[in-house]
Amino acid sequence: MGILADRKRRKANKEAARQRCRDYVAIYFATHSCTDCGESDPVVLTFDHVRGTKRANISDMIRDGLGIESIKAEIEKCDVVCFNCHSLRTQERSGAYRWRIGKVARE
């Protein structure tokens, strides 16, 4: 097998592994809903790292070709939340000014 054929094969294998990880995350979102509000549309769901030390964003791990077991381990550190709830959680954790104003407005 030539060098170019070997490169193509490795590239195809890496892309197949990425696709398996993408499929795993898609199925995960399809079977989970937002921890805070119950939203279940997979298009608006994301991961919020709340336990342990964050290794990396899960999408970055998939892009970089990390294995499915690494990605599963990272997902275990997360809650599934919708983008709105993730934004609210992030603002609250950081003590952001926008969060304090919004909290007063909601009361």
Residue ranges and their predicted role:
Residues 1-107:
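Contiguous alpha-helical segments
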